[in-house]
């Protein structure tokens, strides 16, 4: 069993983009930014507990941070992890909450 404290730290934010909106409409999939060390099992448990929905599958990827320049210095943005969470048929997550 995964501790509740850990589940609250797994999901960082929903990832809203043009691609994630299209995927959500077509395949009932929601996209989240998650902790870089989060596993698929932790992500599945966190979404199921926090949003009270049934999760069908989880796919993850790590986006590598881009190299950026500020003045003469070269820096690098942090790597971050993204999770595509497919919900069971009939399940839905409402991020807006009551807005019509």
Swiss-Prot record:
tRNA processing in keyword set: no
GO cellular component term, pick one: ribosome
A single GO BP: translation
Annotated keywords: Ribonucleoprotein, Ribosomal protein, RNA-binding, rRNA-binding
InterPro entries the UniProt entry points to: Nucleotide-bd_a/b_plait_sf, Ribosomal_uL23-like, Ribosomal_uL23/eL15/eS24_sf, Ribosomal_uL23_CS
GO molecular function: rRNA binding; structural constituent of ribosome
Biological function: One of the early assembly proteins it binds 23S rRNA. One of the proteins that surrounds the polypeptide exit tunnel on the outside of the ribosome. Forms the main docking site for trigger factor binding to the ribosome.
Similarity comment: family membership: Belongs to the universal ribosomal protein uL23 family.
Subunit-structure text: Part of the 50S ribosomal subunit. Contacts protein L29, and trigger factor when it is bound to the ribosome.
Protein name listed in UniProt: Large ribosomal subunit protein uL23
Organism whose genome encodes this protein: Shewanella denitrificans (strain OS217 / ATCC BAA-1090 / DSM 15013)
Biological classification of the source: Bacteria, Pseudomonadati, Pseudomonadota, Gammaproteobacteria, Alteromonadales
Gene: rplW
């Amino acid at each position: 069993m995964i501790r509740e404290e850990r589940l609250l730290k797994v999901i960082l934010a929903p990832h809203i983009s043009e691609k994630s909106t299209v995927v959500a409409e077509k395949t009932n999939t929601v996209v989240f930014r998650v902790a870089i060390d989060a596993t698929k099992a932790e992500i599945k448990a966190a979404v199921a507990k926090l949003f009270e929905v049934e999760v069908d599958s989880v796919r993850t990827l790590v986006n590598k941070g881009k190299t950026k320049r500020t003045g003469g210095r070269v820096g690098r943005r942090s790597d971050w992890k993204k999770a595509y969470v497919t919900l069971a048929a009939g399940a839905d997550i409402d991020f807006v909450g009551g807005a019509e």
